[in-house]
Amino acid sequence: LENGLLRKPPMG
């Protein structure tokens, strides 16, 4: 689940 936490830029 890449809700923004696993992504480079923390959007979530």
From Swiss-Prot:
Expression tissues: Placenta.
Keyword list, A-Z: Glycoprotein, Glycosidase, Hydrolase, Lipid metabolism, Lysosome
PTMs per UniProt: Glycosylated.
Broad EC category: hydrolase
GO process terms (BP): carbohydrate catabolic process; glycolipid catabolic process
Principal localisation: other
Catalytically driven reaction(s): Cleavage of non-reducing alpha-(1->3)-N-acetylgalactosamine residues from human blood group A and AB mucin glycoproteins, Forssman hapten and blood group A lacto series glycolipids; a neolactoside IV(3)-alpha-GalNAc,IV(2)-alpha-Fuc-nLc4Cer(d18:1(4E)) + H2O = a neolactoside IV(2)-alpha-Fuc-nLc4Cer(d18:1(4E)) + N-acetyl-alpha-D-galactosamine; a neolactoside IV(3)-alpha-GalNAc,IV(2)-alpha-Fuc-nLc4Cer(d18:0) + H2O = a neolactoside IV(2)-alpha-Fuc-nLc4Cer(d18:0) + N-acetyl-alpha-D-galactosamine; a globoside IV3GalNAc-Gb4Cer + H2O = N-acetyl-alpha-D-galactosamine + a globoside Gb4Cer
Cellular compartments annotated: Lysosome
GO molecular function, one term: alpha-N-acetylgalactosaminidase activity
One cellular component term from this protein's GO annotations in UniProt: lysosome
Listed EC numbers: 3.2.1.49
Keyword Transit peptide appears in the UniProt entry: no
Subunit structure: Homodimer.
Functional summary from the UniProt entry: Removes terminal alpha-N-acetylgalactosamine residues from glycolipids and glycopeptides. Required for the breakdown of glycolipids.
Family as reported in the entry's similarity comment: Belongs to the glycosyl hydrolase 27 family.
Protein name: Alpha-N-acetylgalactosaminidase
Organism: Bos indicus (Zebu)
Primary gene name: NAGA
